Regions:
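Glycine-rich phosphate/diphosphate-binding loop of Rossmann-like nucleotide-binding domains
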Residues: 5-11, 21-29, 143-203
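Short glycine/serine/threonine-rich phosphate/pyrophosphate-binding segments
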Residues: 4-11, 37, 74-88, 92-106, ...
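Short glycine-rich anion-binding loops that position phosphate/pyrophosphate groups of nucleotides
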Residues: 1-2, 58-59, 98-100, 108, ...
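Short beta-strand segments
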Residues: 30-32, 52-54, 95-97, 123-126, ...
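Short coil/turn connectors at secondary-structure junctions
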Residues: 23-26, 47-49, 87-91, 98-99, ...
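Short, acidic/small-residue loops that bind anionic groups at enzyme active sites
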Residues: 103-139, 197-202
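Phosphate/nucleotide-donor binding subsite
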Residues: 45-90
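N-terminal glycine-rich anion-binding loop in soluble enzyme alpha/beta folds
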Residues: 4-62
Length: 205
């Protein structure tokens, strides 16, 4: 298992998830070095009965470039975890590994599921005085053009509806100012496209 600390962090996190989701029918597929995983499982209490360990002796290094991960990643713990989602063996995948590789492998194996969406995004949710705010993209892409910013708005709306249960989320475009002349050309163009597409329910933040 990749990540900065491997199973020594992941397995205690699984144990906490088991406790928090007590009573729910949730099982865990753990991909990585079987011996290391089982050693960690033995130290965190009785959670092994809810876990299935799938051995993989290869990992994607934290400093490995996404393009290299795509060429050499098959058979790694990260690849196998995403492939389990693709084949319906898992409903979702959680990784503390190489973010760029996670995005690249996920896009390759899972594809973008809606027409017109080209890039995945990383979303973060946090509480505010008015409820939960979801922000994306927070790290999957270094640069984004106007069309991709609109895609993030579409994905953010769908995420908020599906995960947080809102019926009509407020959508805002983060910029250096609320005036139409402020910000990079890509941001100004994205704001225009969002308005024309009927997604504008907040304007610029």
């Amino acid at each position: 298992m990749g990540g900065d600390h491997g199973p020594s962090v992941i397995i205690p996190a699984v144990a906490r998830a088991v406790k928090r989701l007590d009573g729910r029918d949730v099982r865990y597929l753990l991909h990585g070095d079987e011996a290391a995983i089982r050693e960690c499982l033995a130290s965190v209490g009785d959670v092994a009965s809810l876990c299935e360990v799938r051995h993989s002796d290869r990992v994607i290094a934290m400093d490995e470039k996404p393009a290299v991960a795509l060429r050499r990643g098959k058979g790694t713990s990260l690849w196998n975890a995403i492939e389990a989602v693709k084949t319906g063996q898992a409903n979702g995948a959680v990784s503390a590994g190489n973010t760029g590789a996670l995005m690249a492998v996920s896009k390759l194996l899972l594809r973008m599921q809606s027409p017109g969406l080209e890039r995945p995004a990383i979303v973060a949710s946090w509480p505010t005085l008015k409820g939960i705010t979801a922000v994306l993209d927070v790290g999957a892409n270094v640069t984004s053009d106007a069309e991709q910013l609109v895609e993030f708005a579409i994905m953010g709306e769908a995420f908020h509806q599906a995960v947080h249960g809102s019926t009509k989320p407020t959508i805002g475009l983060l910029n250096v100012g609320s005036e139409d002349v402020k910000g990079h050309e890509e941001v100004r163009e994205a704001q225009r496209l969002i308005r024309e597409g009927g997604l504008d329910r907040k304007s610029v933040v």
